[in-house]
Amino acid sequence: MRGSYHNHPGYCDGSGTVEEFVAAAQAAGLAAVGVSSHAPVPFTCSWTMTLERFREYVADARVVQERWRGSYPVWVGVELDYLDAELVPDGAAFQRAHVLSVQLDYAVVSLHFVGRDSEGQPWAVDESAESFAQQVDVVYGGNVRRLVEDYYRLMEHLAAWAQGLRIPVVVGHLDKVKQWNVGERYFREAESWYQE
């Protein structure tokens, strides 16, 4: 079904209302729309929902979904981060207890957190260009290949983890790690190690 399912209303770092997303999807001629604000995580993160905001989001989105029932498909989901057990030991238990315990129509499963920053906190690969440069230099000792290989190794783990979620999933931004590689600043994407 031709639709848009990776959308962030203003409950996390996104903007706009669920109703505005529905109207925009209809205007674009899409057959359906899904909303998928960033799910809460068990540590401080500026761009995910808090638990309280998550409950508000689901309730508000269900109201909009009900309003459109029978006339336009609206799916209520989240963008759910893969939280590697070595990085966030309580991540899976937190998600089961607080996010996956809520009835959702689907999830966009994504990888943002790769390793720790210099202060020991989970580090998001897409935080900023400056953060990425610092992570490459400080945490990876200038070895961007190692960071990229860590990212794709974790993507393999994400694929296995997602199969057990018991809701439909869409994999989000498979190649997020190259977001800051504009002009091949860090590596050549044609290199054999990257292509493999």
Predicted region positions:
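Amphipathic repeat-derived elements
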Residues: R2, R62-L104, V109-R145
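Amphipathic alpha-helical segments that form well-ordered structural scaffolds
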Residues: D60-V63, H98, D150, L154-H157
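An N-terminally biased module of ancient metal coordination in phosphate/nucleic-acid-related enzymes
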Residues: M1-A93, V99, K178-E196
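Domain-core and long-helix interface of multi-subunit machines
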Residues: Y11-D13, L104, V109-E196
